[in-house]
């Protein structure tokens, strides 16, 4: 009786381990998929903020020396454009000035386009392309495309954190911090 019980428990554990391994295989992302997921996640958060923040407060600065809310978003979008251009082997454009994007709608559209363009390049590159090397337009160092992408994802995350402070100082709650409906 005792041996039968032990055999059943061991058999059950082996089946469970097999199922867990099969499930893990199915959920493992390829390198380019992992980059794309992170890229899209921070993009979603920043776009939600850009769409949510009142247009009347788009030029709000917590302190005079800081960028405005709009300028922060434009800086992120311009940095995304830098990634896209470098990954494609092109010269980056430099048009993130607030004078080029006067309305909330224009800022939001540019931010959305910058994340969409970056996502398209990541998809186009795939795993092999993520391992290709490029020269960073900012630091002039040679990096893999995936490292450049992760650097920009981190950069966007840093600005997301700064914009959370803008929300709080303006007496608002950022979209990600609100209770889920």
Say what each PLM segment does.
Residues 38, 102-136, 143-158:
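Acidic/histidine-rich alpha-helical segments that form the ligand environment
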Residues 36-40, 44-47, 57-96, 136-181:
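Short, contiguous alpha-helical
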Residues 1-6:
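Positively charged n-region of N-terminal signal peptides that target proteins for export
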Residues 18-22, 26:
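Boundary at the C-terminal end of the N-terminal hydrophobic targeting segment
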Residues 26-38:
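N-terminal beta-strand motif that seeds the catalytic metal site of vicinal oxygen chelate
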Residues 7-17:
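Bacterial N-terminal signal peptides
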């Amino acid at each position: 009786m005792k041996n039968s019980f032990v055999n059943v428990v061991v058999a059950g554990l082996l089946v469970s381990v097999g199922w867990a391994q099969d499930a893990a295989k199915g959920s493992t992302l390829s390198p380019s998929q992992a980059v794309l997921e992170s890229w899209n996640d921070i993009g979603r958060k920043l776009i939600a903020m850009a769409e949510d923040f009142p247009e009347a407060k788009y030029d709000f600065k917590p302190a005079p020396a800081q960028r405005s809310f709009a300028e922060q978003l434009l800086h992120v979008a311009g940095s995304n454009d830098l990634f896209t251009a470098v990954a494609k082997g092109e010269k980056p454009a430099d048009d993130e000035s607030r004078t080029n994007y006067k309305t909330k709608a224009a800022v939001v559209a540019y931010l959305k386009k910058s994340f969409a363009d970056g996502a398209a390049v990541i998809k186009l590159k795939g795993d092999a392309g993520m391992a290709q090397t490029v020269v960073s337009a900012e630091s002039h160092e040679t990096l893999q495309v995936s490292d450049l992408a992760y650097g920009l994802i981190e950069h966007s995350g840093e600005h997301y954190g700064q914009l959370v402070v803008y929300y709080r100082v303006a007496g608002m709650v950022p979209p990600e911090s609100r209770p889920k409906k």
